[in-house]
């Protein structure tokens, strides 16, 4: 097993990772609420925790990876009504779109993708345990709420006391609650809501609150105490704080050993926001950029750092990834099994073992590319392909990548080949001015030509 230190949000420091069960890792990541297309922020969560999943496996662990799907909540009910369709029709469609986006980004499907609506009995069971322990109460409006002041550890993830939270956090005002920080476990049904959004319970018809969904699904699939829980930084409070209160309140055991949170996505140095009009779906981005470029761009930043999205940064990522593929295009590395005793691999593993430091790990890839360009080393090419593969990169044929690229270049492969043939004819006819003109025309269109021995010409997108 590779040595691994992870920044634990709960401890506010890097800590050695020691799995509860030797050689095995149980990991849960908060997934999508499926009522709309996935955006760039979702892409970061997908790719970051796919990277974590891949590295844990590469390090020799047997990983059970769970990422939930929220398929019932207020936004889903509202959107289905606006569209004139059932909740099931809406969520099934957007689950499919989510899977398509994740696959495009090279994300390995989690071992389990529980849907909230399939785990309502487990949620009701957990709520019943909380009520029996005096941690939950039914309010006058019919909702069942969690009493935060009854849980001694509330605030330990966010590092704030109840007084700090009451003073500084925006919480919903509700006269039926005993405390403004109390949160809903079971939402009482409204007459106007569709039947498919309601389940029977001893507290009356209703549906689960968002927070109880993750507690019930994670504990059901991974046990009441597991290794890693991840999600975006925006979920740290209140969602993850509330998960701890629910899960530890119900079981009386520690819930999660390591809490991981990826940083925010910023658009041109501003926070991504629909209200600012700087909100991009994954599908919009993939119209202009190859999906592997987007994955490379996300992994180029440390997962806890802010990620600044811009066309300029994506263009830089495209050029950088092109450098790596170019180094591999004339090599035949054969297999891609990594020699972990080799110096580059040791540096790569050391970086990944330091809280998944992908920027440093990726710098090792460029060192290998330089060695390949300098020496033509097949061993270096094999290391480059193998190490990059642990990040889900460089898994395609180099020529396929190099001749792909942006979909809005305005010049097709067929047009490129036609111009190359015309240039070859011009050279045979010793019309070198015309041959140079065609090369310049292609270069202006972002196409780089490389004349090979024997008269062949290869091309790639710049």
Curated annotation (Swiss-Prot):
Reaction catalyzed: tRNA(Cys) + L-cysteine + ATP = L-cysteinyl-tRNA(Cys) + AMP + diphosphate
One GO cellular component term noted in the UniProt record for this chain: cytosol
Top-level taxon in the UniProt lineage: Bacteria
Cofactor binding comment, as recorded: Binds 1 zinc ion per subunit.
Motif extent ('HIGH' region): 32-42
Cellular localization per UniProt: Cytoplasm
One GO term of the biological process aspect: cysteinyl-tRNA aminoacylation
Enzyme class of the recorded protein, top EC level: ligase
Essential cofactor(s): Zn(2+)
Gene Ontology terms, MF aspect: ATP binding; cysteine-tRNA ligase activity; zinc ion binding
Signal peptide (residue range): none
Major site of localization recorded for this protein: cytoplasm
This protein's UniProt keywords: Aminoacyl-tRNA synthetase, ATP-binding, Cytoplasm, Ligase, Metal-binding, Nucleotide-binding, Protein biosynthesis, Zinc
UniProt EC number: 6.1.1.16
Residue window of motif 'KMSKS' region: 271-275
Binding site for ATP: 274
Annotated Zn(2+) binding sites: 30, 214, 239, 243
Name of one Pfam family that matches: CysS_C
InterPro entries: Cys-tRNA-ligase, Cys-tRNA-synt_Ia_DALR, Cys-tRNA/MSH_ligase, CysS_C, Rossmann-like_a/b/a_fold, tRNA-synt_1_cat_dom, tRNAsynth_Ia_anticodon-bd
UniProt cross-references to PANTHER family, sorted A to Z: CYSTEINE--TRNA LIGASE, CYTOPLASMIC, CYSTEINYL-TRNA SYNTHETASE
Family membership noted in the UniProt record: Belongs to the class-I aminoacyl-tRNA synthetase family.
Assembly and oligomerization: Monomer.
Protein's recorded name: Cysteine--tRNA ligase
Gene (UniProt): cysS
């Amino acid at each position: 097993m590779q040595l691994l230190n992870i920044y634990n949000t709960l401890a506010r420091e890097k800590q050695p990772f020691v799995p509860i069960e030797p050689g095995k890792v149980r990991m849960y990541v908060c997934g999508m609420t499926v009522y709309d297309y996935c955006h760039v922020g979702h892409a970061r969560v997908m790719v970051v925790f796919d990277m974590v999943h891949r590295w844990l496996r590469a390090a020799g662990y047997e990983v059970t990876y769970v990422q939930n799907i929220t398929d019932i909540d207020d936004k889903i009910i509202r959107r289905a009504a606006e569209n004139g369709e059932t909740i099931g029709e809406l969520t099934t469609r957007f689950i499919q779109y989510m899977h398509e986006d994740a696959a495009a980004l090279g994300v390995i499907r989690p071992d389990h993708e529980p849907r909230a609506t399939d785990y309502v009995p487990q949620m009701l069971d957990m709520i019943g345990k909380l009520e029996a322990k005096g941690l939950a109460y039914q309010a006058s409006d019919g909702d069942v709420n969690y009493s935060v002041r009854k849980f001694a550890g509330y605030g330990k993830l966010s590092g704030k006391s109840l007084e700090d939270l009451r003073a500084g956090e925006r919480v919903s005002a509700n006269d039926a609650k005993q405390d403004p920080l109390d949160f809903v476990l079971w939402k009482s049904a409204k007459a106007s809501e569709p039947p498919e959004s309601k389940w029977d319970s001893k507290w009356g018809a209703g549906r689960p609150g968002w927070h109880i969904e993750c507690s019930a699904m994670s504990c059901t699939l991974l046990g009441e105490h597991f290794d890693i829980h991840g999600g975006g930084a925006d979920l740290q409070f209140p969602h993850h704080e509330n998960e701890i209160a629910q899960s530890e309140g119900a079981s009386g055991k520690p819930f999660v050993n390591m809490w991981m949170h990826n940083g925010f996505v910023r658009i041109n140095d501003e926070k991504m926001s629909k209200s600012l009009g700087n909100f991009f779906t994954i599908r919009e981005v993939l119209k202009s950029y190859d999906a592997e470029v987007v994955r490379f761009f996300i992994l180029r930043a440390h997962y806890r750092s802010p990620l600044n999205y811009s066309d300029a940064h994506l263009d830089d990522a495209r050029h950088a990834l092109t450098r790596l593929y170019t180094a591999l295009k004339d090599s035949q590395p054969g297999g891609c099994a990594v020699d972990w005793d080799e110096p580059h691999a040791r540096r790569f593993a050391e970086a990944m073992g330091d809280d998944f430091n992908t920027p440093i790990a990726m710098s090792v890839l460029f060192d290998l590319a330089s060695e390949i360009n300098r020496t033509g080393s097949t061993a270096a090419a094999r290391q480059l392909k193998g190490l990059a593969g642990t990040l889900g990169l460089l898994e395609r044929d180099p020529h396929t990548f190099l001749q792909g690229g942006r979909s809005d270049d305005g010049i097709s492969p067929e047009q490129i080949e036609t111009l190359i043939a015309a240039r070859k004819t011009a050279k045979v006819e010793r019309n070198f001015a015309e041959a140079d003109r065609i090369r310049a025309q292609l270069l202006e269109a972002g196409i780089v030509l490389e004349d090979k021995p024997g008269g062949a010409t290869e091309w790639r997108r710049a």
